[in-house]
């Protein structure tokens, strides 16, 4: 017959379940589509009006750069959209005048 090994049975291999491969079903998983909501992060620049986003201050901008050299997203940094745009622009300006590196070497 067609040269194929027909050992899978009639179900096309559906005779297996998760226990056959050492995987156990996650009984504590949340319902599908439900997200965990943590505490709302407050934008540090909205909370303290004295703080200024300045591209000439690389120590303040390093907080918003990941270990790999990428800009940290809003959901992690806690910035509002307005200040996240300003932080991103400041990081780009600081990189262009060599105050911050474009890449991080390991």
UniProtKB/Swiss-Prot annotation:
One of its GO terms (biological process) is translation. The keyword Heme does not apply. InterPro entries: Ribosomal_bS18, Ribosomal_bS18_CS, Ribosomal_bS18_sf. Keywords: Ribonucleoprotein, Ribosomal protein, RNA-binding, rRNA-binding. It holds the Pfam family Ribosomal_S18. Residues 1-39 are annotated as: Disordered. Disulfide bonds: none annotated. One of its GO terms (cellular component) is cytosolic small ribosomal subunit. It comes from the Bacteria. One of its GO terms (molecular function) is small ribosomal subunit rRNA binding. Binds as a heterodimer with protein bS6 to the central domain of the 16S rRNA, where it helps stabilize the platform of the 30S subunit. Belongs to the bacterial ribosomal protein bS18 family. Part of the 30S ribosomal subunit. Forms a tight heterodimer with protein bS6. This is Small ribosomal subunit protein bS18. It comes from Sorangium cellulosum (strain So ce56) (Polyangium cellulosum (strain So ce56)). The gene is rpsR.
